[in-house]
Swiss-Prot record:
Species: Wigglesworthia glossinidia brevipalpis
Xref: CDD domains: Arna_FMT_C, Arna_like_SDR_e, FMT_core_ArnA_N
Binding site for (6R)-10-formyltetrahydrofolate: T137, K138, K139, I140, D141
SUPFAM superfamilies cross-referenced by the UniProt entry: FMT C-terminal domain-like, Formyltransferase, NAD(P)-binding Rossmann-fold domains
Name of the protein in question: Bifunctional polymyxin resistance protein ArnA
Region (Dehydrogenase ArnADH): 313-654
Residues annotated as binding NAD(+): D346, D367, I368
GO molecular function, one term: UDP-4-amino-4-deoxy-L-arabinose formyltransferase activity
GO-annotated biological processes: lipid A biosynthetic process; lipopolysaccharide biosynthetic process; response to antibiotic
C-alpha cells in the first residue's frame, strides 16, 4: 500500500517507523526542519529516519500551495498519514489519496481538539487522556475514529512523563490498527460533538504564573510546562524565575505571590501555597533553598514574586462595568497576558473579587456618577476605553425606559466625548438589537437597514439608544478622527450572564430564567409560543473576538463595525428550552431535581407589559469578523448550555 507521510517529533518518528516495519511503501515524507535555535530538540529526527531508508523527504514552508499539491497528486498515494505534523493540510491535499487521509491526535477525541492537548490536559487537571487515530476532514479533528487508546494521568505526571506514555500508546495503537488498514479493513465510528472541547495553540509567554490562582492550578501549570518545554515563570527583582517543579503546601494564606519561607522555599497562592523544588533564576539553577538565598540576597525580607517586570510598557485599558458579564470575562483573559494593565469600575464586585490584589488590576467599587473625576483621569491616562455600563434586560426596557436611556445613552455619551477630547481609542459595545425588525436573511454591518417599531412600544428604547450612539461615534470618527471600533454581540451566553437573585424576580435573560425555573421546579414561561429565533454565541468565542479587536493587528479594526455572533447556533426559544430540559434531566440522577412543571404560555404583553414588541429573528453576517479578526465561532449550543448549567448547579445548589 502506497502512502505519503506528514510527520514530526517523537510520535512522528514512531509513526514513520511503524509504517516501514509493517511493509507500507512510503512514497515521500513531509516534515519540519530540526531547528535547534528555536526549540529544544529532545526527540528523534524524522528527517534522518527518512534519509536512512532512502525516502524522499521535504520540509516546505507552505505545503498547501499548488506546486506541492501537484507533486503529491502525481505520487498517487492510497493513503496520507499525519503524525504530529504542525501545519493544517488543505482540503485539496486531503482528497488526493484513494482511501483517505488519517491523523494521530494526542487526546481522546472529541475532547481536546486543536493544539497542545498534552499540555492542556495537565493544566486542566484531567485524570485521563489518550491517543486517537482518525480520518482527516476539512473540520479539524472532526473525522470518524478508527482507534483510540486511553491513558491514566497520575498526580505526579509531568509533560515529559506523560509524553512518554503517549509515545507508547501511539506505538500500541499503530501496531494494532495499521495491519488492518494494510488489509484494507478500515472500521470507523463517528466522532460526535458530545462532550467535545477545543483548545488553542500555546506559546512560551502563556507560561506566566498568576499567583491569584489556587496552588493546585499553579502546580498543574508548572508540571504541564516543565522541561523540555519552556516552563512556567514569574519575576523576582525584575528578572525571570522559571519554576520547573513544585508541590502543594498547606502554609497559611497571605497576599498571593508572597514568599512565606526560604527553607523550604514556599510561595503563597490564592488558596494554599506552593513549595518550590526546582527553579531557574536568570542563568542559575535553584535546586535547594540555600541557593536561592545566596542568589537573590533576600534572606529575612518580605517580598512578592511579581507577575510582570514593570507597568511602563503595558497597554492600559479602562473597563467601565468591569464586574458585568462581558467585563469579567474579558478581564479574566487580559490578566493572563503580560501586556495589559486594567482599570475597572463597577457598582458590584462579586465576579472580579478574585482579581483584586493582582498588580495589573486596579478596581473602584462605585457608581461612575460619583467617581467622574476618577473616570475622567483614567480616560486621559489609558490607551483603550471599553464602556460596558448598560441595562441590557428586556424587562427593564418596558418598566424603566427612562433609566435605560439615562444609563445606556447619556452616561455613555459623556464617555464618548471624553474619548474625543483626549484622542483615545474607544471600543464600543453596540447590540444586535439595533437591527430591530430588519428583513434581511443575514444582518450586515454595512448594508442592512435598522428597523424599529412605533414610539408607544417602549422596548425599542434600548435599541434606539445604542443605535444613536453608534451614529454619534461614527460622526466623531469622520469629523474629529475619533479612533473607534464598534462591536455588535449576538446573544452571547455563558456562565455569569445573570445571577439567580435576578431570576428569582423573574427578571433574568432567557437562558438563566429557564435554568432557574427548571432547577427550582417552577413552570417555564414561554413568551409568544417561543417561535422567536436567536443565534446564540458562547461567551468564550465572543471574548476571543473582542480580544482580537483589542489587539487590533495592523490597525485593521480602526473605524469598523463588527458583528460577533454564531449564525450556526440558530434556535427558537422553544428549541433552546427543550435542549436545556434534556441536559438537566439527563443529569437528574446526580442532583435529584424537581419534576418538570410544564410550560406557562404567555403573550409578550402579559409577560413584559404594555409597550413590548417581539423580534422574530436576528442572524449575523460575520464576514467582516472573519476577515479582520481571523475569527470564527467554534462552540456548539449544547456545550455552552452544559457549562452554564454546571455553573449554576455548583454555585446555587447544595
Amino acid at each position: 500500500m502506497k502512502v505519503i507521510v506528514f510527520a514530526y517529533h517523537e510520535i512522528g518518528y514512531i509513526g514513520l517507523s511503524c509504517l516501514i516495519k509493517l511493509g507500507f511503501k512510503v512514497l515521500s515524507v513531509i516534515t519540519h526542519i530540526d531547528d535547534h535555535a528555536s526549540e529544544k530538540i529532545f526527540f528523534s529526527s524524522v528527517k534522518k529516519k527518512s534519509l536512512k531508508h532512502k525516502i524522499p523527504v521535504f520540509y516546505p514552508k507552505n505545503i498547501n500551495n499548488l506546486k506541492w499539491i501537484d507533486y503529491l497528486s502525481k505520487l498517487k498515494p492510497d493513503i496520507i498519514f499525519s503524525f504530529y505534523y504542525r501545519k493544517i493540510l488543505s482540503e485539496d491535499i486531503l482528497k488526493i489519496p484513494k482511501l483517505g487521509s488519517f491523523n494521530l491526535h494526542g487526546s481522546l477525541l472529541p475532547k481536546y481538539r486543536g493544539c497542545s492537548p498534552l499540555n492542556w490536559v495537565l493544566i486542566n487537571g484531567e485524570k485521563t487522556t489518550g491517543v486517537t487515530l482518525h480520518r482527516m476532514t476539512k473540520k479539524i479533528d472532526h473525522g470518524s475514529i478508527l482507534s483510540q487508546y486511553s491513558i491514566k494521568i497520575e498526580e505526579k505526571d509531568t509533560s515529559k512523563s506523560l509524553y512518554k506514555k503517549l509515545c507508547y500508546a501511539s506505538m500500541y495503537i499503530l501496531n494494532k490498527t495499521l495491519p488492518m488498514i494494510l488489509k484494507n479493513k478500515i472500521n470507523e465510528i463517528d466522532c460526535t460533538d458530545d462532550f467535545s472541547s477545543y483548545f488553542h495553540k500555546r506559546y512560551p509567554k502563556d507560561g506566566l504564573i498568576d499567583w491569584n490562582q489556587s496552588a493546585n492550578n499553579i502546580y498543574n501549570l508548572i508540571r504541564a510546562l516543565t522541561k523540555p518545554w519552556p516552563g512556567a515563570f514569574s519575576y523576582l527583582f525584575d528578572k525571570k524565575i522559571i519554576i520547573w517543579k513544585s508541590k502543594i503546601s498547606f502554609e497559611s494564606y497571605k497576599t498571593p505571590g508572597t514568599i512565606l519561607n526560604f527553607n523550604p522555599l514556599i510561595i503563597s497562592c490564592k488558596k494554599k501555597s506552593l513549595e518550590i523544588l526546582s527553579a531557574q533564576y536568570t542563568e542559575c539553577n535553584i535546586l535547594n533553598k540555600r541557593n536561592i538565598e545566596n542568589i537573590s540576597r533576600i534572606k529575612g525580607k518580605k517580598l512578592i514574586i511579581k507577575n510582570i517586570k514593570s507597568f511602563k510598557n503595558l497597554k492600559k485599558i479602562l473597563i467601565l462595568g468591569v464586574n458585568g458579564f462581558i467585563g469579567y470575562h474579558i478581564t479574566n483573559l487580559l490578566l493572563k497576558y503580560n501586556n495589559y494593565k486594567i482599570y475597572g469600575i463597577d457598582i458590584k464586585n462579586n465576579l472580579v473579587k478574585s482579581f483584586i490584589g493582582n498588580e495589573k488590576f486596579c478596581f473602584i467599587k462605585g457608581d461612575i456618577k460619583q467617581y467622574y473625576n476618577w473616570v475622567k483621569k483614567k480616560i486621559k491616562k489609558c490607551d483603550i476605553i471599553l464602556p460596558l455600563i448598560a441595562i441590557a434586560r428586556p424587562m427593564q426596557y418596558i418598566k424603566n425606559p427612562l433609566k435605560v436611556f439615562k444609563i445606556d445613552f447619556e452616561e455613555n455619551l459623556k464617555i464618548i466625548r471624553y474619548c474625543v477630547k483626549y484622542k483615545k481609542r474607544i471600543i464600543f459595545p453596540s447590540t444586535s438589537e439595533v437591527y430591530g425588525m430588519c428583513k434581511d436573511d443575514y444582518f450586515d454591518e454595512e448594508n442592512s437597514n435598522l428597523v424599529t417599531g412605533a414610539i408607544k412600544n417602549q422596548r425599542w428604547i434600548y435599541s434606539s439608544s445604542k443605535q444613536l450612539l453608534d451614529r454619534i461615534i461614527w460622526a466623531y470618527g469622520v469629523k474629529n478622527n475619533l479612533n473607534f471600533t464598534i462591536f455588535r454581540p449576538f446573544n452571547w451566553i455563558g456562565p455569569g450572564l445573570d445571577d439567580f437573585k435576578i431570576a428569582e424576580k423573574q427578571n433574568a435573560r432567557v437562558t438563566t430564567q429557564i435554568i432557574f425555573n427548571l432547577i427550582n421546579g417552577l413552570p417555564v414561561t414561554i413568551v409568544n409560543n417561543g417561535n422567536q429565533k436567536r443565534c446564540f454565541t458562547d461567551i468564550d468565542d465572543g471574548i476571543e473576538a473582542l480580544f482580537e479587536i483589542i489587539k487590533n493587528k495592523n490597525n485593521k479594526c480602526n473605524k469598523k463595525i463588527i458583528n460577533i455572533g454564531n449564525p450556526h447556533n440558530e434556535y427558537t426559544i422553544m428549541q433552546l428550552t427543550k435542549i436545556i430540559i434534556n441536559i438537566i434531566y439527563s443529569n437528574n440522577r446526580n442532583y435529584n431535581f424537581p419534576k418538570f412543571s410544564g410550560f406557562n404560555m404567555l403573550s409578550g404583553t402579559n409577560y413584559y407589559g404594555e409597550g413590548y414588541q417581539d423580534i422574530d429573528r436576528r442572524k449575523p453576517n460575520i464576514d467582516i469578523a472573519k476577515k479582520l479578526l481571523n475569527w470564527t465561532p467554534k462552540t456548539k449550543i449544547r456545550i455552552t448550555l452544559r457549562k452554564i448549567i454546571n455553573f449554576f448547579i455548583n454555585n446555587n445548589t447544595s
